[in-house]
Amino acid sequence: PYTPTHAALLARRNGLRVVGSVDHDSIGAAAEMSEATSILGMGSVTGFEIRARFGEGTPLAQRKLNNPDSVGVAYMTVQGVPAPAREKVAEWLAPGRAARLERTLAMAERANQILTDLGLEPFDPQADMVGISQYANGGGITERHLLAAMASALIRGFGRGPALTEGLAQMGVEVPASLAAVLSDADNPHLMYDLLGVLKANYLDRIYIQPTDELPSAAEVVAFADSVGAIATYAYLGDVSASPTGDKKAEKFEDDFLDELFEHMESIGLRAVTYMPPRNTPEQLARIHALAAAHGMLEISGVDINQPRQRFTCEELRRPEFADLNEATWALVAHEALSSVDPSLHLLGRTGRLTPEALAERISQYAPLGRAIADGEDAAAVAARATSIN
C-alpha cells in the first residue's frame, strides 16, 4: 500500500532503523528505497521475491511447501542485491513478469464472469488492475492486484455495510468471525484491503490458474543470485493456525517434513532462510533456528507489509532471544552496500558454505559496518574495514 519512500518514512517514524523492498518479480523499488533510507539515516536491504519449482525429482515436488496456491512451488527471496546488478536482475525477471501478467489477465476474465453472473458490473483489468500497479515502471502484477480490483467491484456492486457481507454469503465466501464486523462497517477506511485478504484466503482458488513455464527452478534462482552477488533464501512459512492479516486460512505446510526440506535446500546451494517471527509459534521458531544453525544458513527475519492495518514494529524482535536476528539484519545491510563497492566483500563469500562458527564471526564483523553505513559513513570508506572470504 506504500511507495518505497513512504514505507521508509513510516518505518523511521515507528522507530525502525532498517527497512527493505523485496517485491514479487521486481527489483524496481530498490533504487528509491536505497535513496530514501540514506536520507533518513537508515539501513536498507533490497531484492525480490519469486515463485520457483522446488524439489524436482524428489517427494517435495508433490507437496505443498510455503505456497497456499500450488503444490511443488515455493516462494523464494533474493536479498542484498548489489546496486550495480539491478539492471541485470530486472532483465532476468522480465520474461516471468510478463508471463505472470498474461496469466493474471486470464484470471481476471474468470473473476469478471463471476461478477457478471451475480448481476454486478465487471471491472476493467487494464484500468483497475494494471493501472493501479507499478507495472509500467518495472513493478510486478500479483493476485493482490487482481483481488483488489475484484474487491472494489464487489464493494461497488453490493454496497457497504451489512449488504456487503450478505452478498459475500450469496457468493459462498467464508468470512472469518474475526473479520465479519469490519467487513460490515460502512465507515471502514480499509475495507478494500480487508476484503482482499478474505478473498485471497477463501476464494482465490475459484479463479486461480496454475503457473507453468513462467517459473524457474529453485536451483536456477540460487545460481542466478550467486552470479550477481546476492543471497537466495527459502521463505519458511510453517503450519498456519491463524493468519494475522486474514489472507491465509488455517493449513499445514512444511512442518511435517522440515528436516527433509533443509537437506534439499542445502543440496541445491541455498545458504539462507528467511521467516517472519510474528507469524510463527515459539516452537516453530526454535526449530527453524536449530535447523538453520545445523546447516550453516544465514537467518533473515522481517515482515512484509501487505495492508495498512499492519504495524511496522515487530515486538518479537525486541526479545533477547532474537538479538542474533537483529545482528544478521545489520550484517545484510553491510553486505548490500559493501558488495556494491567491491564484489569480493560478499557476506557469505561468493562460493562455498560457512561453518556455523565462521558465519557467526562474519555476522559479528559485518553488523557494526552496517550500522556505520546507516549512520552516514561512506560505504567505500567502510569497505576498507571489511575482509573478503573468496
Please report, for each region that a protein language model flagged, where it lies by residue.
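Charged, amphipathic alpha-helical linkers/stalks
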Residues: 84-92, 106-109, 342-363
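Phosphodiester-processing cores and adjacent nucleic acid-binding clamps
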Residues: 19, 42-59, 71-79, 104-106, ...
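Outer-membrane beta-barrel translocator/channel fold
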Residues: 310-318
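Non-catalytic, alpha-helical, charged scaffold/linker segments
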Residues: 84-176, 370-389
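Active-site gating loops and adjacent loop-to-helix segments of metal-dependent hydrolytic enzymes
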Residues: 56-99, 148-206, 318-339, 346-347
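Short, charged low-complexity intrinsically disordered segments located at boundaries
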Residues: 135-146, 181-183, 359-364
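An N-terminally biased module of ancient metal coordination in phosphate/nucleic-acid-related enzymes
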Residues: 1-72, 196-224, 228-229, 234-310, ...
